[in-house]
Amino acid sequence: MRFRWNAWNLEHATKHGCTVDEIESVVRNAGRGYPRKLGDGKYLVEGRGTGDRFVEVIFIYSPPQTIYVIHAMPLSRSGR
């Protein structure tokens, strides 16, 4: 599984306190039912991040078979 990082998505994906390692781990260890297709080429994964917190990651494939993360943030208890 390949990830593509650049200045834009690195800043955008980590602005809510998630690390690159945490984001990649959530995607790599996605459970049954993930990734979930959202439309417009976007996919959602939710899973355990660092310290047992739940993290939401949204990504696109760009180029094909390469994950380009566009959003990541910890989920509150009500958001799980």
Which stretches of residues belong to each language-model region?
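Ribonuclease/tRNase effector modules and their secretory precursors
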Residues: 1-80
